[in-house]
Amino acid sequence: AVAARKSKTPIRTFAIGMQKDAIDLKYAKEVADYIGSEHTEVIITKEDVLSALEDVIGLLGTFDITTIRASIGMYLVCKAIHEQTDIRVLLTGEISDELFGYKYTDFAPSAQAFQKESEKRVRELHMYDVLRADRCISVNSLEARVPFGDLDFVRYVMAIDPEKKQNVYRKGKYMLR
């Protein structure tokens, strides 16, 4: 939102999803409308996913289903950005899940358990998420900037009282919102 306000021209935003039950597309559109971005939805089909599967597995060098599932969308949206635009540098939301929670922290039994899980995921970022994202982005001749990965920002968020980060409002990543 800050970048959109400061920019003289509308920033470009992208979201990917399938037509059916596209809740992420809905929320991305709401944000895009709110900040006034030039928004592009990349609608994919089951066939698109299946046809990209072999490329993504080869790219990642793993058959781990969680890693592959998390990579297909990023790979396909980056492919679309490369093929349909002249954009070559992206801002991503990578690492926000690890810092502010997602499905795995929505039901943490306590704030301390939430914090412990966040710390574990931040420590393991380089092994999974950063590598996965870098490969999916760079194979499509794009570069990523990851503002949530700024070390000072990570330290700041990790130092926040876990009670304040725990999802008691039933809104994912509510502190980030």
What are these regions (language model features)?
Residues A1-R177:
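ATP-dependent adenylate-handling active sites, centered on carboxylate activation for C-N bond formation
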